Amino acid sequence: MTTIQKIYSRSIYDSRGNPTVEVELTTELGTFRSMVPSGASTGEWEAKELRDNDKNKWGGKGVTIAVHNVNNIIGPALVKSDIKITDQRGIDEFMIKLDGTNDKSKLGANSIVGVSMAVARAAAAFLKIPLYEYIGKLAGSKTTECIPVPSFNVLNGGRHAGGDLAFQEFMIMPIKAPTFSEGLRWGSEVYHTLKALAKKKYGASAGNVGDEGGIAPDLTTAEEALDLVNEAIKEAGYDGKVKIGFDVAASELYNGKLYDLDFKSEHPKPENKLDYKKLYEKYSALIEKYPIVFIEDPFSEEDWGAFSYMSSKTKVEVIADDLTVTNVKRLSKAIELKCANALLVKINQIGSLSETIDAANMAKKAGWGLMVSHRSGETDDSFIAHLAVGLEAGQMKSGAPCRSERLAKYNELLRIEDNLGDSAIYAGTRAADYIKSNTL
């Protein structure tokens, strides 16, 4: 049984050019690496990412303290502990106890999750199985042959782009593709059609891309964005086959009482400040007009009643992200209050693989769907592709089919599908079992 010989961390750069944590873990089988992502629109209750806050370097975004914590605290303690590399939960719990806080703010979630991911890779190598199969065994998954439907963020707004567009992400899902590889092709074709349409309608700059690879034309309303995306789907030849979802990231719009659809505008209109019932009416109108199958974070992370209200009425998938932050305590409350019917899964939100699995299993037991997610500040680490397959998640989002850090995850799913051969199952419409059939 192999043990950890050495753990080393360094500061590298993410897709936004900001520092992030890289971890290398060595056993007698070799060295196994992980790279930690970082979010821009983050939930208040996420595990704490440790930054240096030294304004003289990297604008305060350095991670030298987090790197130091891996090299001088976590690493030596794990090597000394002699915990077996295959004891994922034992290692994760050891690090959580070593941190000693409720939110990992002492050592940093970005330190702990980097080690947790590297441990998983080393354990899979020791067991001579793919990483997704290892995660599946930890999770008790029935199968690790299901490839998720990709959710491509093709048009950016909110905090991910300039302009006045309030909603953060407009996504397309090739639900009716026969395979993942075909779904990726469909998504790529719609994306390029969309980019050409945007440049034709709004000028060359409309083809510029945001943090996650989606285009960022200077739009004002959700209707403008959805019209453009829907037109691209039709022009690419996938009307009725490719569906739409969007992430409102509504905590960014909320002022404690009302939701301000003009929160980015220099000329806000009073009529665009809505209470949750009026905002739900807006969502309902959009659902009736466009082929929408899911809405993520439709309300603020503390507006529990609004989530429950919408979930009791809507016919689409309601995905909880900032509300639940991959945290079993928050998720348990959301399940009890019937706030949503799907969980967005982000491993760095909670800070360890074991806790991520716990949240995913709790959601599945409640009949919720799963969508595994990247972050806006990414690396070329493809871990979440394996996480999605291992957890039997029907859906995964990793940005547009553009920018190498986004394609790293989709390309890894292509490899997994190829390796599985005839046993590979594309989630397809089954990814939306939680969506009423009349939306498909």
From Swiss-Prot:
GO BP term (any one): glycolytic process
InterPro entries on file: Enolase, Enolase-like_C_sf, Enolase-like_N, Enolase_C, Enolase_CS, Enolase_N
Catalytic activity: (2R)-2-phosphoglycerate = phosphoenolpyruvate + H2O
Pfam families cross-referenced by the UniProt entry: Enolase_C, Enolase_N
Chief location category: cytoplasm
Cofactor binding remark: Mg(2+) is required for catalysis and for stabilizing the dimer.
Keywords on record: Cytoplasm, Glycolysis, Lyase, Magnesium, Metal-binding
Cofactor(s) the protein needs: Mg(2+)
SMART domains hit by this protein: Enolase_C (SM01192), Enolase_N (SM01193)
Annotated metabolic or biological route of this protein: Carbohydrate degradation; glycolysis; pyruvate from D-glyceraldehyde 3-phosphate: step 4/5
EC number(s) recorded for this UniProt protein: 4.2.1.11
Active site: E212 (proton donor), K346 (proton acceptor)
Similarity comment: family membership: Belongs to the enolase family.
Protein name in the entry: Enolase 1-2
Biological classification of the source: Eukaryota, Fungi, Dikarya, Ascomycota, Taphrinomycotina
